[in-house]
């Protein structure tokens, strides 16, 4: 079954997560219209190869045209309009940047796959009694459901008792007025006095029964409000707080957050019960106005009951106003809470009280740093204005599940300029990527005579003015959400708390697993721990400061740990994603471990790891070989950076890599990917066939072109290159490269510099095993 069809069969909570994957940058309508074609393309490859991305993008436009023709035949005006608008947007946004749309689509497809896996796992675990976490959660939810049912039942029981009291009071009122009327009209003789006393006794008995029932109802109302308070505290302080914490974790790459639908149903049910109870308390006031007496419990307790129920309802409504989707730039979906000035970002708020009468009644206004203006000025932080559509009315039509929400899609930030370039205080102690800002959402609710001011805010965001600030800004978001669940601590980085390696390790692994199919292994994390903390045996519980993580340079390096790691993450996502997902890249491994595992392997065995000396991120391969005397040697090639991988895929580099031996013969030192996977089996499928790379010659051409192939070559010695069959210009480049190579990374055995050149495939090259 197609992936898109499987997704549409998921539960509502998963469909809401699916909805959150899509935005204007890649509309869900397009995913729906072209589902089979989209799933048939290799978007991951297109995201790493610009020429292929351009081809796929133009094919996408062609598919849109074909679909438009179908809608034209069906006279579907709405779909025609939407598809035309989508095509115009894609052309304006991605025509010059086709790799961006490829990355976005690849990311969406991968997230869809993860969503299906999560749903399948949850379905399997749902029936397993031996799964402790699932059992605890289910039991807790069942208890909450029981408490809510109990509240609803008590409300209904009170409703019946109120009717009984009202009937009894009407009888009492009628008999009392009748007796009074008869007493005024008749002479009070002996017989009449006896009858009157008898009727008075009956009235006293009725009043006693009425008083008992009133006291019972007042007591039950007080108990009901206490039960509501308990359920409300469980919902807001536990369930909703847990959801908000999970949202924080999901923002920094952790497991996806659960859907709000169930929580919305619980809160809505409680709110309905509270409003019904408030009406019952108002009914008590009506009863009091008809019949009152000395010691009336309604007079004594009704004002307090009214105050309690109103306070409960107000607090519930305020807690139910949440940010369902945190601020995020559509072009950087994997890094929410970082906003660049002048670039649109999106966010979504939701009211978890689903009252149809509130549809299109709540106007939401957005502002930034509403409550921290004075603090921001003291800290020297920048100030911003929100531009774009910063007001919107909540409605139930825009959400798939009919929730009361408002999505802001066209917000931007602009810095308020002042005389010193925007900083309110030149002596500010925080750098801009450590400044935290809050985006606030406000509205007013008028419901059943109550006016309630609602306000919620986003998690703290970092505002940047240049995309080069993204790495440090994202580090701030990671550190904040890793170490605190305080949603408003904008002064967090004035004295940032210390984290433990266990916390940092989990978050670092999330940075890979959230954007790829593979997190970090224990061995890879141990290597990273050594980079941060130095040699050790057990890093559990070791403390890591914010400065150590992000600001201080690593020992012997001119850059910090996070800058180095973030560039590797970017390298993986953009250039070697498929190889990483396959598990072919060992990545983080110490030199000692590298030598230990390779030295026992046959010559030609190699592994792939990340460069430790390249600030911009580099990947290299290390292999084992035997020298003339039979001694084992470990060799590493100079790391390949993003600039080189833009021109040739890493798989093609590995498949074509050669060493020029002393006799000027090209040989391949790479045979088996560790531990024993044949190179062709591992990387062959990621190399484009030569028939696609070299178009056939024009039959009418007098002299057909010779086919060429780009390969990477490492000369053993520059003096031995004079006999290599290549052009003088290529030879000069090779000589210059061999004499002037810089920035090489030392290895245990030796260091090799490689040159990529274009070799003619003619008879002179027959001795080269290509």
UniProtKB/Swiss-Prot annotation:
Summary of the tissues where the protein is detected: Detected in lung, heart, oviduct, ovary, uterus and kidney (at protein level). Detected in ovary, oviduct, and at lower levels in uterus and lung.
Domain SH2: 580-670
Keywords on record: Acetylation, Activator, Cytoplasm, DNA-binding, Nucleus, Phosphoprotein, SH2 domain, Transcription, Transcription regulation
List of residues that carry N6-acetyllysine: 49, 87, 601, 615, 631, 685, 707
Major location (coarse): cytoplasm
Modified residues (Allysine): 601, 615, 631, 685
Post-translational modification: Activated through tyrosine phosphorylation by BMX. Tyrosine phosphorylated in response to IL6, IL11, CNTF, LIF, KITLG/SCF, CSF1, EGF, PDGF, IFN-alpha and OSM. Activated KIT promotes phosphorylation on tyrosine residues and subsequent translocation to the nucleus. Tyrosine phosphorylated in response to constitutively activated FGFR1, FGFR2, FGFR3 and FGFR4. Phosphorylated on serine upon DNA damage, probably by ATM or ATR. Serine phosphorylation is important for the formation of stable DNA-binding STAT3 homodimers and maximal transcriptional activity. Acetylated on lysine residues by EP300/p300, promoting its activation. Acetylation at Lys-49 and Lys-87 by EP300/p300 promotes its activation. Acetylation at Lys-87 by EP300/p300 promotes its association with BRD2 and recruitment to chromatin. Deacetylated at Lys-49 and Lys-87 by HDAC1. Acetylation at Lys-685 by EP300/p300 promotes its homodimerization and activation. Deacetylated at Lys-685 by HDAC3. Acetylated on lysine residues by CREBBP. Deacetylation by LOXL3 leads to disrupt STAT3 dimerization and inhibit STAT3 transcription activity.
Protein's GO biological process: astrocyte differentiation; cell surface receptor signaling pathway via JAK-STAT; cellular response to leptin stimulus; defense response; eating behavior; energy homeostasis; eye photoreceptor cell differentiation; glucose homeostasis
GO molecular function: chromatin DNA binding; DNA binding; DNA-binding transcription factor activity; DNA-binding transcription factor activity, RNA polymerase II-specific; protein dimerization activity; protein homodimerization activity; protein kinase binding; RNA polymerase II cis-regulatory region sequence-specific DNA binding
UniProt subcellular location: Cytoplasm; Nucleus
Signal peptide (from-to): none
Sequence motif: Essential for nuclear import, positions: 150-162
Family label: Belongs to the transcription factor STAT family.
Name of the protein in its database record: Signal transducer and activator of transcription 3
């Amino acid at each position: 079954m197609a992936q898109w069809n499987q997704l549409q069969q998921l539960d509502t909570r998963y469909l809401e997560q699916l909805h959150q994957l899509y935005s204007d940058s890649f509309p869900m309508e397009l995913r729906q219209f072209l589902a089979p074609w989209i799933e048939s393309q290799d978007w991951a490859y297109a995201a790493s190869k610009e020429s292929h991305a351009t081809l796929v993008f133009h094919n996408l436009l062609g598919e849109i045209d074909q679909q438009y023709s179908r809608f034209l035949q069906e006279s579907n005006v709405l779909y025609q309009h939407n598809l035309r608008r989508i095509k115009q947007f894609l052309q304006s946004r991605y025509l010059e940047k086709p790799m961006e749309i490829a990355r976005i689509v690849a990311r969406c497809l991968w997230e869809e796959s993860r969503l299906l896996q999560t749903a399948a796992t949850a379905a399997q675990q749902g029936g397993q009694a031996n799964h402790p976490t699932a059992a605890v959660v289910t039991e807790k939810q069942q208890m909450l459901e029981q408490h809510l049912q109990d509240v609803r039942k008590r409300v209904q029981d009170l409703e019946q008792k109120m009717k009984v009291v009202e009937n009894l009071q009407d009888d009492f009122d009628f008999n009392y007025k009748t007796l009074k009327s008869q007493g005024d009209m008749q002479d009070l003789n002996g017989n009449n006095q006896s009858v009157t006393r008898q009727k008075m006794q009956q009235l006293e008995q009725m009043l006693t029964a009425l008083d008992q029932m009133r006291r019972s109802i007042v007591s039950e109302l007080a108990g009901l409000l206490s039960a509501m308070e308990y359920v409300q505290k469980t919902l807001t302080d536990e369930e909703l707080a847990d959801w908000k914490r999970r949202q924080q974790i999901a923002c920094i790459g952790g497991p996806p957050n659960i859907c709000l639908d169930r929580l919305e149903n619980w809160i809505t049910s409680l709110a309905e019960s509270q409003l019904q109870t408030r009406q019952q308390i108002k009914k008590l006031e009506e009863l009091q106005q008809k019949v009152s007496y000395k010691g009336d419990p309604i007079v004594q307790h009704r004002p307090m009951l009214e105050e309690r129920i109103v306070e409960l309802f107000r607090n519930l409504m305020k807690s139910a106003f949440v940010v369902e989707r945190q601020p995020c730039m559509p072009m950087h979906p994997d890094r929410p809470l970082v906003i660049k000035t002048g670039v649109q970002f999106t966010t979504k708020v939701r009211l978890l009280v689903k009252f149809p009468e509130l549809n299109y009644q709540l106007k939401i206004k957005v502002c930034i740093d509403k409550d921290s203006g004075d603090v921001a000025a003291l800290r020297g932080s920048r100030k911003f204005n929100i531009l774009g559509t910063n007001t919107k009315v909540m409605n139930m039509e825009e959400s798939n599940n009919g929730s009361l929400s408002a999505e802001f899609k066209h917000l931007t930030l602009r810095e308020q300029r002042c005389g010193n370039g925007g900083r309110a205080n030149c002596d500010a102690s925080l750098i801009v990527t450590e400044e935290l800002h809050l985006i606030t959402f406000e509205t007013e609710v008028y419901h059943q005579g109550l006016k309630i001011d609602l306000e919620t805010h986003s998690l703290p965001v970092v505002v940047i003015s240049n995309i080069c600030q993204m790495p440090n800004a994202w580090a701030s978001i990671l550190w904040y959400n890793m170490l605190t669940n305080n949603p408003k601590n904008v002064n967090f980085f004035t004295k940032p708390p210390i984290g433990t390696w266990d916390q940092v390790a989990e978050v670092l692994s999330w940075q890979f697993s959230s954007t790829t199919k593979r997190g970090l292994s224990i061995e890879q994390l141990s290597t990273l721990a050594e980079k941060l903390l130095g040699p050790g045996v057990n890093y559990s519980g070791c403390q890591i400061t914010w400065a150590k993580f992000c600001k201080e340079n690593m020992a012997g390096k001119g850059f910090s740990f996070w800058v180095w790691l973030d560039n590797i993450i970017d390298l993986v996502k953009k250039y070697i994603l498929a190889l990483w997902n396959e598990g072919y890249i060992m990545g983080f491994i110490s030199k000692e471990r590298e030598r230990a595992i390779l030295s026992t392997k046959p010559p030609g065995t190699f592994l792939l790891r990340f460069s430790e000396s390249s600030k911009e991120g580099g990947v290299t391969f290390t292999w084992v070989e035997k020298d003339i005397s039979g001694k084992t040697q470990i060799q590493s090639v100079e790391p390949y950076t993003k600039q080189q991988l833009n021109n040739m895929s890493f798989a093609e580099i590995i498949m074509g890599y050669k060493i020029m031996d002393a006799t000027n013969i090209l040989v391949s030192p790479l045979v088996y990917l560790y531990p024993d996977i044949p190179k062709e089996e591992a990387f062959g499928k990621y190399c484009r066939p030569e028939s696609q790379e070299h178009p056939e010659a024009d039959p009418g051409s007098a002299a057909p072109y010779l086919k060429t192939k780009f390969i990477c070559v490492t000369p053993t010695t520059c003096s031995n290159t004079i006999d290599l069959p290549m052009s003088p210009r290529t030879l000069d480049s090779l000589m210059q490269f061999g004499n002037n190579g810089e920035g090489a990374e030392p290895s245990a055995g030796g260091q090799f510099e490689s040159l990529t050149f274009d070799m003619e495939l003619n008879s002179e090259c027959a001795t080269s095993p290509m």
